[in-house]
């Protein structure tokens, strides 16, 4: 049996309102639990449109047929009008999710984090994280114990900025296996659970066709030599590609794969995890930098 952590990112108002309820129903039908990470502040995702001037981002949008994949309400959110507050508008849905699934913070403002966190000070990072955690805790009525950086925009500064919040784990980077981030010699931070597998929008196109994606990603899960962690998005697998995701759950079960919340991947003694660090890097299919796992020594 292969155990795969299932992470569900919720970036937008529509993803929360439409995608999450469908995913909750789908997961319930198949007896699967996952980790949901919510954006809870303003939905300004449409402001990413200016990135179309960048060739790699434009190619990604064309390759994934973004207009039909996400819908124009997502692609234009927060452009000609102020972005609506996601958490306030969907508190009931988020609360229901937290009743049945592990629930953590993705971002206060997904667009702002993805665009500006790379040059924010530690204080600015801490204030933004605190704002998101406070809002999410007010909605779900219990402490937030985990987080996942929006767009995997994380480095050593982000690791340090999250330390005051006493989280059980963070999932801020791409990598191969769980690790303890090294803050300084002799001091480690909150365990990291990296995403190890590509997302739909990173690979779909000339290399992998939509109709063969599930077969392809299942083979990657079975071949994963580390701790497999897979990310889906409420805006994609919860809306237009919900049937594809349901088919994935069936095929994965038949292949001996069991999905679980990320928190279930943590060992009883996190001190046994190897040391590592998060550095800025790039991966195929994703525009811009993102946090990547790198080995580190204790000295």
UniProtKB/Swiss-Prot annotation:
Example of a GO biological process term: lipopolysaccharide biosynthetic process
Family according to the record: Belongs to the polysaccharide deacetylase family. ArnD deformylase subfamily.
Signal peptide span: none
Taxonomic lineage of the native organism: Bacteria, Pseudomonadati, Pseudomonadota, Gammaproteobacteria, Enterobacterales
GO cellular component: membrane
PROSITE patterns: NODB
Pfam families reported in the protein's UniProt record: Polysacc_deac_1
Keyword Ubl conjugation: no
The protein's annotated pathway: Glycolipid biosynthesis; 4-amino-4-deoxy-alpha-L-arabinose undecaprenyl phosphate biosynthesis; 4-amino-4-deoxy-alpha-L-arabinose undecaprenyl phosphate from UDP-4-deoxy-4-formamido-beta-L-arabinose and undecaprenyl phosphate: step 2/2; Bacterial outer membrane biogenesis; lipopolysaccharide biosynthesis
Annotated function: Catalyzes the deformylation of 4-deoxy-4-formamido-L-arabinose-phosphoundecaprenol to 4-amino-4-deoxy-L-arabinose-phosphoundecaprenol. The modified arabinose is attached to lipid A and is required for resistance to polymyxin and cationic antimicrobial peptides.
Protein name: Probable 4-deoxy-4-formamido-L-arabinose-phosphoundecaprenol deformylase ArnD
GO molecular function annotations of the record: hydrolase activity, acting on carbon-nitrogen (but not peptide) bonds, in linear amides
EC identifiers of the protein: 3.5.1.n3
NodB homology domain residues: 2-260
InterPro entries named among the record's database cross-references: ArnD (IPR023557), Glyco_hydro/deAcase_b/a-brl (IPR011330), NODB_dom (IPR002509), Polysacc_deacetylase_ArnD (IPR050248)
Domain of life of the organism encoding this protein: Bacteria
Key words of the record: Antibiotic resistance, Hydrolase, Lipid A biosynthesis, Lipid biosynthesis, Lipid metabolism, Lipopolysaccharide biosynthesis
Keyword Metal-binding part of the UniProt annotation: no
Catalytic activity, as annotated: 4-deoxy-4-formamido-alpha-L-arabinopyranosyl di-trans,octa-cis-undecaprenyl phosphate + H2O = 4-amino-4-deoxy-alpha-L-arabinopyranosyl di-trans,octa-cis-undecaprenyl phosphate + formate
